[in-house]
């Protein structure tokens, strides 16, 4: 099986397991990242709530998630669990999240090249069906959501 497919299905499994726990605690599960890199694997869970997330919020969610992970044991390698807010360089995971930030500057990295490139930085113009529309200089790109490896808002300090 292709490694990207394994990571993708692992993310789906973790999302299904952990999102209900986060929601039950009164937070939004903004997204989950899992990078399997041998002994330095990382499970990062982003939480959000109206008014912002405090360190205490992260600690509460981390304790609950740790308990679930200990019982369910979905990850076979050693890993570090990190619970955090999305922050200023907010990662984007879903089409709904992209739609919410239309008009913002974004940085997107694809899993594989699209039109000869993997990295795009520009204006988020919209969402069309399963594509994210990004304007880079004078060219619009329709990037399929399933090709996006990582996407972040670029904060503006105007």
From Swiss-Prot:
<dbReference type="GO" id="GO:0006412">
    <property type="term" value="P:translation"/>
</dbReference>
<protein>
    <recommendedName>
        <fullName>Ribosome maturation factor RimP</fullName>
    </recommendedName>
</protein>
<dbReference type="GO" id="GO:0005829">
    <property type="term" value="C:cytosol"/>
</dbReference>
<dbReference type="InterPro" id="IPR003728">
    <property type="entry name" value="Ribosome_maturation_RimP"/>
</dbReference>
<dbReference type="InterPro" id="IPR035956">
    <property type="entry name" value="RimP_N_sf"/>
</dbReference>
<keyword id="KW-0690">Ribosome biogenesis</keyword>
<dbReference type="InterPro" id="IPR028998">
    <property type="entry name" value="RimP_C"/>
</dbReference>
<dbReference type="GO" id="GO:0000028">
    <property type="term" value="P:ribosomal small subunit assembly"/>
</dbReference>
<dbReference type="InterPro" id="IPR028989">
    <property type="entry name" value="RimP_N"/>
</dbReference>
<comment type="similarity">
    <text>Belongs to the RimP family.</text>
</comment>
<dbReference type="InterPro" id="IPR036847">
    <property type="entry name" value="RimP_C_sf"/>
</dbReference>
<dbReference type="Pfam" id="PF02576">
    <property type="entry name" value="RimP_N"/>
</dbReference>
<keyword id="KW-0963">Cytoplasm</keyword>
<comment type="function">
    <text>Required for maturation of 30S ribosomal subunits.</text>
</comment>
<dbReference type="Pfam" id="PF17384">
    <property type="entry name" value="DUF150_C"/>
</dbReference>
């Amino acid at each position: 099986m292709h490694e990207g497919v394994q990571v993708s299905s692992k993310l789906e499994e973790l999302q299904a397991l952990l999102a209900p726990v986060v929601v039950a605690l009164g937070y939004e599960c903004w997204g989950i990242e899992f990078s399997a890199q041998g002994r330095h694997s990382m499970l990062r869970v982003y939480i959000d709530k109206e008014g912002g997330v405090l360190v205490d919020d992260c600690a509460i969610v981390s304790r609950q998630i740790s308990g679930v992970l200990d019982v369910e044991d979905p990850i076979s390698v050693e890993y570090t669990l990190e619970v955090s807010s999305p922050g200023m360089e907010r990662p984007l995971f879903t089409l709904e999240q992209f739609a919410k930030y239309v008009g913002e500057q974004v940085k997107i990295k694809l899993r594989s090249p699209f039109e000869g490139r993997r990295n795009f930085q520009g204006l988020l113009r919209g969402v069309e069906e399963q594509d994210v529309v990004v304007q880079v200089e004078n060219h619009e790109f329709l990037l399929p959501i399933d090709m996006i490896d990582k996407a972040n808002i670029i904060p503006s300090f105007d």
